[in-house]
Amino acid sequence: MEFEGRIIDTDAQGYLKNSTDWSEALAPVLAEQEGITLTEPHWEVVRFVRAFYQEFNTSPAIRMLVKAMAQKYGEEKGNSRYLYRLFPKGPAKQATKIAGLPKPVKCI
């Protein structure tokens, strides 16, 4: 894909091949490809998965994401129903893609 005059390499599923190519300016473009318009709740999850990746060097699968979100933000946001409303095709897959991170290992 081309963004701001340079080529950004992605895999066949649209995940960035190099997470250092990511920027907050690129996130809305990636979200649009997923049919998502980013709102503040989306950004909260995107920033959360980026912080998770930086701390643990892995993208969180859905169970891990729900548990970690519940610990940080409480049950209201740390549940799969809330996350699926934001990311209908799979919170772990879509949030990590929009965050410019590798696909979670346990996602098909």
Curated annotation (Swiss-Prot):
Its main location: cytoplasm. Keywords: Cytoplasm, Transferase, tRNA processing. Pfam families: DsrC (PF04358). InterPro entries: DsrC-like_C, DsrC-like_dom_sf, DsrC-like_N, DsrC/TusE. GO terms for cellular component: cytoplasm. It comes from the Bacteria. It is an enzyme of class 2 (transferase). Its EC number is 2.8.1.-. The keyword Cell inner membrane does not apply. It is found in: Cytoplasm. One of its GO terms (molecular function) is sulfur carrier activity. The active site is at C107 (cysteine persulfide intermediate). GO terms for biological process: tRNA wobble position uridine thiolation. Interacts with the TusBCD complex. Interacts with MnmA. Belongs to the DsrC/TusE family. Part of a sulfur-relay system required for 2-thiolation of 5-methylaminomethyl-2-thiouridine (mnm(5)s(2)U) at tRNA wobble positions. Could accept sulfur from TusD. This is Sulfurtransferase TusE. The gene is tusE.
